[in-house]
């Protein structure tokens, strides 16, 4: 009970609501945690309190903590570990706390998929699945689906008298392909798998079309649309009421009033019918008749008011006309006939989906693979069984988990789906009033509906639970925001109090939902939120595409100007670490976009202004010239009859034909493919002037034949390396600008092929299809780049990527871009509640029209899209800590402002439903909201009017401005002073310096650098160099300590007889340890075969291969450490890293400025992840035996001391990047098979 909960300690940092969330117990608890409210800290504190509870302590492995990402799970473990270590400092003798620390790595703190995997691994025998299964690659999964579906459809086409199937094909495919039908089957399969019982959902979908003995009033689609009809009639009626008010003004068109009142009476009739039934509305719509407006002499009245009255009435009439045409032009029974006609076709479609699901599951089972939806469904299958009434109930395994888990805690609960909810339900107590489920989230930040997240689960509980938790679950609101300034919070509240409601938005933005100030900031200048609306220029080329390009350019230019001005002026932001204000830096800025198409243009504009910028574009890899050329080579190897790829290869540096030579070749055979023409040309004797062309083509033709033969017999990865080597293309691109990057791109292609070969597919043709599917899904890979915390750049990212992050200054751009409604335009629509909806198509009569189900689903999806976009906007606005700047571009600002002002004097906080539901972009919500605030008066010059005081005078500060696009694109004027200097230079005259700045020029010329000490130390160091800095002078000549890596190259002839150097031998051994296949047996024969392969791939020279002592490599894998490598969960080898390190740590003699950092780079030989943590291994090939009189025991402390700094830096790099401690650091010496565990 509540009275038994621990009281909040005196002076506690926790708010009352946070403390309640930490200690509340005895029932299911839902914590609605607003942005920046410290939910993770609360969650960690709750777990700690449970673990160290004096009366009833809970072991950490008796808690199930479900997070949204693996990174969040690791962060949670780290925080819990740090908190337990602090407790241990106060209670060093506590065996319980020590036990919890030892249990932490085994605790169930993970994503839902990791928990599912744990359940499946433990109870795989209850499923028809190989316990050695692997997680399928997404593209591999797509290709498997394609294969299975092709086989099913081919069978169906081959069945005689398959009438219903061919009816399905006629209705939903084109003359050219059945792609649309395939998309339907796959979409239905995917949607069904988002439900706990996929088959049951599919059956309900068919049942909805069985209308035998039903009237239209019985249909769920009609019931939903009837609510929408009421909404639209109400909107239209509001237009007439507004028109009537205007007509009644002193200079309004009074003769219009009689007609407008008749219109109101008509809407009264229609609305009454809508409250009765569909049939009533249908009949009322047939009798709609509009009175003709009386003629008036417009000069007798205010012309603007007359126009407004007439426009409002026309809008109302258009709303009714739209309803008549869409819904009430057909008799109710005709809609029922559509359902009857489509029922058998839909039944066949669902049957195909079920067959597909069954065969797809079987194929995955045969290949020993599962996907992420399988993990959820397999877990659910283990945790549930069917009751007598056909419903799902907990299985014996589920009951075991219920007994095991004292509490289940779910983070980001708003992003849970139906299947995940069922899994959680089966491992927690049944009763909400006595439950053990603790859920944390913010439904206002639920932005993953496209991943089938279901915010309705959160909303349902939020409405059902009470703050007292009496008779059911308890809800706790964490509304205090500890992230942002008052100006950001009040600005966000002001907008969302007006746009987010239950009818439109799915959530009431009431007093409980409002953000409340929790952070304290010093007084700041220019902290008001801003809305900058850009008026596009008048002349736009290239239609809509050109307009989009210009919008991006305008917004980028404006943001660049603002960022530069803020940095140059020393705009200050608060630094919590120093508890003081400091000048803003580039890394304090972020530009948020709904999606990334504008990002390249924004980056380009910022770079032109000298602003460092970064965006993870994740595109461009396959567009890179070197990758594109190689992909064309592989397309030609697969099928040389493809003209475009072959022409591209012939024209590339690989063959090197110029345009004239290509034309000459084509002239030799105007018919047939390029390949046929090339083959024919090579058979004849060339003319003298064609000899060079002949030689080029003959060289390439012979290579191509060899590659095609090799591709049929050898692995794809070997083929790729063979092509790289025989063409010399890999070395060629290395000599081009950005050569290292180009070679890295080619290595990535090789790695992709290796990954592909690890799947169930083989062969070049399928690999090319594999890549095509990656591109079709839009999964092109960008160049990887790791950003350090200290990198001073402006970041550009999507709003989705920004979730959970915070920045001092936030620009939200592209607010005038239209919402993406493409999903609503599809030929068929799917919905979790309403099932399937498509056009009615009669191929015989060649007619098609919209059905009732399609209209209902489209309307429902539109309202859900509106709600999702509101939540996305909320996430964007709540990322800002100190300054929020909103930017959008419109084509005609005057016209848009008229529209936005339409609801300005609305008497309630919440804007009218039709204004919010009718929005096509974010500006359609933001601008009407801000135009009701006093801070927009300088722009509007309209006065308060009848806007309520609490809205007009709301405690928030805004700057609202319309920016002329022409001024942004105009070139910047050259300053007069600069112009004079330029003129003097052009005429080769002496530059005038008799000015106020003469002394400044002298001072600059005589200036000495303040931090001269820093110039004598390098800003970038390798780990090896730092290690040498720490070595004493006496020991610096011990060559056996030094570890050198050299590039792989053949030794010059004059050195051949001298044998390999120590460094070259070390490099060779390291190369073998990097590339040895750990999945194969480690034997002499296998290793020798792999070393030979490395020589073929030019990873080793012949000389190096001969020097490798294979038995020493085997000795390592026979050692305890080597066996741990083979048994590890994961093994990473030759891991490069860079990190920032305090200069004092790198240089013992550092005398420079405190706080300076240097960039450290290095390569970690090997790291292994085991159940209880990470171990770091560094391989050494130095000669030790015979070097020390006392043997290895004498050498050990010397070697350990010499390498301690090096391994400490490696460990620090790993811990920073992985956010996970390194448990052990090992040196392995091949000479003598020795292991040294390096301690701090």
Swiss-Prot record:
Lineage of source species: Bacteria, Bacillati, Bacillota, Bacilli, Bacillales
GO cellular component terms listed in the entry, alphabetical order: cytosol; DNA helicase complex
GO biological process: double-strand break repair via homologous recombination
Residue ranges annotated for the UvrD-like helicase C-terminal domain, each copy included: 497-804
Species assigned in the record: Bacillus cereus (strain AH820)
CDD domains: SF1_C_UvrD (cd18807)
Keywords from the named record: ATP-binding, DNA damage, DNA repair, DNA-binding, Exonuclease, Helicase, Hydrolase, Isomerase, Nuclease, Nucleotide-binding
GO function terms (MF aspect): 3'-5' DNA helicase activity; 3'-5' exonuclease activity; ATP binding; ATP hydrolysis activity; double-stranded DNA binding
Cofactor(s) the record lists: Mg(2+)
Pfam family, one: PDDEXK_1
Domain of life: Bacteria
Signal peptide: none
Family the UniProt entry places it in: Belongs to the helicase family. AddA subfamily.
Annotated NCBIfam families: addA_Gpos
Protein function: The heterodimer acts as both an ATP-dependent DNA helicase and an ATP-dependent, dual-direction single-stranded exonuclease. Recognizes the chi site generating a DNA molecule suitable for the initiation of homologous recombination. The AddA nuclease domain is required for chi fragment generation; this subunit has the helicase and 3' -> 5' nuclease activities.
Reactions accelerated catalytically: Couples ATP hydrolysis with the unwinding of duplex DNA by translocating in the 3'-5' direction; ATP + H2O = ADP + phosphate + H(+)
The protein's assembly and partners: Heterodimer of AddA and AddB/RexB.
Protein name (database record): ATP-dependent helicase/nuclease subunit A
Gene3D superfamilies hit by this protein: 3.90.320.10, 6.10.250.2380, P-loop containing nucleotide triphosphate hydrolases (3.40.50.300)
Residues binding ATP: 33-40
E.C. numbers: 3.1.-.-, 5.6.2.4
Classification via SUPFAM superfamilies: P-loop containing nucleoside triphosphate hydrolases (SSF52540), Restriction endonuclease-like (SSF52980)
Start and end residues of each UvrD-like helicase ATP-binding domain: 12-485
